[in-house]
Amino acid sequence: MGESGLPSEDELREALDRVGVADVIVQAVSATASLGFRRVSPEARDLAQARLAIECIRALEPVLREGGVDEAVVRDLEQARANLQLAYAKAVSEDETPTGDPSG
């Protein structure tokens, strides 16, 4: 650590050398799924953003698999995407149901 208590430039470089690109992508996909779930919630509904999250996750799943990411991690991300797709479909149907309709 430098005098200011912050890591030095060399320490930061060493830390970056220990992080794999796949690790960063997995974290980004996980965060994308979380944001997607938030965007299907009634409080923060933005179905275009939720759909973008779904499509991005879908696009990166094979890349992560080919990149050697642990299969269990990829399966977890696929399951998160599937759950997000179900939540998205439910949100779309809720938005299509008239508000005063007792069937919705």
PLM feature spans:
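Amphipathic alpha-helices of TPR/Sel1-like and other helical repeat/solenoid scaffolds
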Residues: A53-E66
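N-terminal intrinsically disordered, cationic/polar leader segments
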Residues: M1-E55, A72-G104
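Inter-helical turn/loop segments and adjacent helix faces that build the functional surface
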Residues: G67-E71
